[in-house]
Amino acid sequence: MDSCEVTKTRIPFKERPDWADVKPVPQDDGPCPVVPIAYTEDFSETMDYFRAIYVADERSTRALQLTGEAIQLNPGNYTVWQFRRVVLEALGVDLREELKFVDRIAGENTKNYQIWHHRRWLAEKLGADAVTNELEFTKKIFSQDAKNYHAWSHRQWVLQALGGWEDELAYCQQLLEDDIYNNSAWNQRYFVVTRSPLLGGLVAMRELEVNYTVQAIRASPENESPWRYLRGLYKNDTQSLVQDSQVASVLWDVLTSQNSHVHALRFLLDLLCHDLEPSQELKSAVDVLTPQSCSPDLALTKKICSILEHADPMRVKYWNWRKSMVRVQLLQSQNAERLANLSVQE
């Protein structure tokens, strides 16, 4: 029997000659279990025999086969997976064959922690030889579930631990061409830009990435992901963000278009709180969107909050609070900037 295949014609362990010497160890639920779990007969017997070989620490071929059957019945049993690793090492099994076993189990259990942990263990043992296979495996998972956290976490681990960075930015590009709203792909793109040893780091990549992101914003200004990505490109360097002419340009483009203005207004508000000196064009764009009930003399930041109260009604209380805190936020930003300058001078 295949180690991961439990069929309707399954032969009970008690009827298998090669298991005749093993005395099964039943589960001990105590003398008076309150709500005992109604296990199937096959599951109970399999686990009874597993407990027997586990207690005996039997590291044999039949033990490996048994763990395969137990995992098929319950892929989430971490004790079975752990013992399987012990047996695999003891037997010196070809781990590439073990990956095939995991592939079959993972097909219907793509969010199972134990399976991903076991796969990482295998990849770590196989080293650089596993890179291509693991990257392709995660691609297969993404074709079914583009936001599978386990697969993304595994892919990032593979890149950092084993390599394979060469085509990763191009892969992110392809994912975003397929779906510009794929926030997981945006996250991976940022991971690659900031972590890849081949690209030179965030500062070196910033201009190219800003160009790409600005184009994405112009194409879909209602998409929050590129706006967040743009912020990330200036992490710990807010002044460069404030001074970037491309940013001001895309803000004006969006605010004067017929598209959703919410993300652009939020972005502009934050820039103003970090001492952005807005152009007359930006001021005029905001004035056009400002409700008639607002005073013409109202500060630009408060005008933006008033617009957002109408454009983003779900957060109306938040924008009302931001309006009341604009002055405080501006002072905090200015104080932080002064402290940063003093630190540089020292």
Curated annotation (Swiss-Prot):
Pfam families: PPTA (PF01239). PFTA repeats lie at residues 59-93, 94-128, 130-164, 165-198, 205-239. GO terms for cellular component: CAAX-protein geranylgeranyltransferase complex; cytoplasm; protein farnesyltransferase complex. It catalyses: L-cysteinyl-[protein] + (2E,6E)-farnesyl diphosphate = S-(2E,6E)-farnesyl-L-cysteinyl-[protein] + diphosphate; geranylgeranyl diphosphate + L-cysteinyl-[protein] = S-geranylgeranyl-L-cysteinyl-[protein] + diphosphate. Keywords: Magnesium, Prenyltransferase, Repeat, Transferase. Its EC number is 2.5.1.58, 2.5.1.59. GO terms for molecular function: CAAX-protein geranylgeranyltransferase activity; protein farnesyltransferase activity; protein geranylgeranyltransferase activity. Coiled coil: none annotated. Gene3D superfamilies: Protein prenylyltransferase (1.25.40.120). GO terms for biological process: peptide pheromone maturation; protein farnesylation; protein geranylgeranylation. Heterodimer of an alpha and a beta subunit. Essential subunit of both the farnesyltransferase and the geranylgeranyltransferase complex. Contributes to the transfer of a farnesyl or geranylgeranyl moiety from farnesyl or geranylgeranyl diphosphate to a cysteine at the fourth position from the C-terminus of several proteins having the C-terminal sequence Cys-aliphatic-aliphatic-X. Belongs to the protein prenyltransferase subunit alpha family. This is Protein farnesyltransferase/geranylgeranyltransferase type-1 subunit alpha. It comes from Solanum lycopersicum (Tomato).
